[in-house]
Amino acid sequence: MVQITLPDGSQRQYPGPVTVAEVAQSIGAGLAKAALAGRVAFDGAEPRLVDTSFRIDNDAQLAIVTAKDADGLDLIRHSTAHLLAYAVKSLFPDAQVTIGPVIDNGFYYDFSYKRPFTPEDLQAIEKKMAELARKDEVVTREEWSRDEAVAYFKGIGEVYKAEIIASIPSNETLSLYREGDFIDLCRGPHVPSTGKLKVFKLMKVAGAYWRGDSKNEMLQRIYGTAWASKDDQDAYLHMLEEAERRDHRKIGRELDLFHFQDEAPGLIFWHPKGWALWQQVEQYMRKVYQDNGYQEVKAPQILDLTLWKKTGHWDNYRENMFTTESENRVYGLKPMNCPGHVQIFNAGLHSYRELPLRYGEFGQCHRNEPSGSLHGMMRVRGFTQDDGHIFCTEDQLQDECAAFTALLQKVYKDFGFTEVLYKVATRPEKRIGSDEIWDKAETALMESLRRTGCEFEISPGEGAFYGPKVEYTLKDAIGRHWQCGTIQVDFSMPVRLGAEYVDQNDQRRPPVMLHRAILGSLERFIGMLIENHAGAMPPWLAPLQAVVCCISEHSAEYAAQITQSLKKQGFRVQADLRGEKITRKIREHSLQKIPYLLVVGDKEMQNGTVAVRGLGGLDLGVIALDDFIARLAEDISTRRNVTQLASAA
């Protein structure tokens, strides 16, 4: 007898070995039809995903996985990647297959082919995929030896797949999945048949180096998306359209904020307007430092390699570090700021009475990211972090973490982000420090979130070897998630670099070090801001807060006077004194997403007033200049958004 325990605790008895599909069928025809895989666990072991054809020989716990489960959606996407490869091989037999993983919201598959795939090719491939899905071919799992698999794939000319398999230890049994005439290496599991794959779309083709190495052949990567329902896919495609409209690279060009060029890959050329936006963000964060007990510091850009070896960065991060040599010494361009802050801490001997000691820096970092991964301001090689480090005692951990989370929530709200997701990454199997101190650190992080009213997820084992962390993820205006802030407990670096304080018993002890950032990379955060607001920045952030437009040359001098008056008040304002029609001026400045347009003609000049238009169709009519000044000052002090006011009007 085999006893199967279901998620609701109920148990079912079977006279002998039973497959996942048979269990689903015994529960109901609807579940059997919806079943994509099973999640099975034996004798209290960790559950694992298996095919519906998986045979259960012993008592087990089993959950039937359907398209409603996150695992089910991943199965659909991974199986659709194989369906893509099947279709490509059907249409282009000379193409060679390589790898095809699941990614966020979809999948990709890399191919080697003698010519680039065209948009017409993608249409034909997608049509072929739909045809193969309609055939509802059974997907079966086969086990091969490594050498058998290498010989097979070499024999059919699949040299890339043979190379992948040859790198697997010879004593491992491999799983291959077959659907129709196509067979591919895969750990699985897969959907039981191609007919389960109903909703998918190929998105684009791009270049990708074999094994991610620029010295290797350039392959063609076909991206696709797959979903459990057409409604889900339609919502995703709509979000993509909106994301394209909001793309910070496009808006950056249109609003003359910044640009990129080939001579500086992964680096940004900031234009005056863009740098004005940057300055507002940095100055805001500088005040955050000042108001919350941080001392701003500045550490060197390059440090001798011996220091990076002491911290462990060289062993674990060297591929991402830029180096330079001078006078027979090798230096590393800093990829992060923490070692420099420890050196500043070590410059003097500190008493426990001085702790917590909080350092903050707008630290410029450089990381040698692969060229293929660079993406506007979201993934760069040179960036600035609002990086801070807190040196404290174990007893101060919880208060410091709670204060940081409360501060982070306020900062995000000020920038227009009100939805934050919280995740606590706990101790990994390989770690340093006693269980007692890990208990204290993890408890401090979780309790700090509870104290600030946060619901959070726990990611077991995802902490660093030197301490647990909290990750803070923002949700933007179109529902995308961006991981920005973090606070991480570090028991290791203070010890490695000899950081000490004198405790109340006159004993020297290493402090606990908290790595913390709210915005993360300022470049990336500004890119997020641009996309979240679709370029229409609230007045407190806008590079230009207002433009004063004269209707004719008669009112040009009055427009110039108003502009100067506003500038003296500290506002960022320009005058448009051109002899163009006022309708053209209004259109041009509206496209530049200026929060306020002040229009002045003979009537306004005679009465000492201004006609005020706000972004998003807000019309304040004709008002006194002092009233506008008061309004703009309130917008800035409250960080109010003009477009939100317009939509509420």
UniProtKB/Swiss-Prot annotation:
Residues 247-538 are annotated as: Catalytic. InterPro entries: aa-tRNA-synt_IIb (IPR002314), aa-tRNA-synth_II (IPR006195), aa-tRNA-synth_II/BPL/LPL (IPR045864), Anticodon-bd (IPR004154), Anticodon-bd_dom_sf (IPR036621), Beta-grasp_dom_sf (IPR012675), TGS (IPR004095), TGS-like (IPR012676). Gene3D superfamilies: 3.10.20.30, 3.30.54.20, Anticodon-binding domain, Bira Bifunctional Protein, Domain 2, Threonyl-trna Synthetase, Chain A, domain 2. Its EC number is 6.1.1.3. Binds 1 zinc ion per subunit. Zn(2+) binds at residues 338, 389, 515. One of its GO terms (molecular function) is ATP binding. The keyword Phosphoprotein does not apply. Residues 1-66 form the TGS domain. It is found in: Cytoplasm. It is an enzyme of class 6 (ligase). Its cofactor is Zn(2+). Keywords: Aminoacyl-tRNA synthetase, ATP-binding, Cytoplasm, Ligase, Metal-binding, Nucleotide-binding, Protein biosynthesis, RNA-binding, tRNA-binding, Zinc. It catalyses: tRNA(Thr) + L-threonine + ATP = L-threonyl-tRNA(Thr) + AMP + diphosphate + H(+). GO terms for cellular component: cytosol. Homodimer. Catalyzes the attachment of threonine to tRNA(Thr) in a two-step reaction: L-threonine is first activated by ATP to form Thr-AMP and then transferred to the acceptor end of tRNA(Thr). Also edits incorrectly charged L-seryl-tRNA(Thr). This is Threonine--tRNA ligase. The gene is thrS.
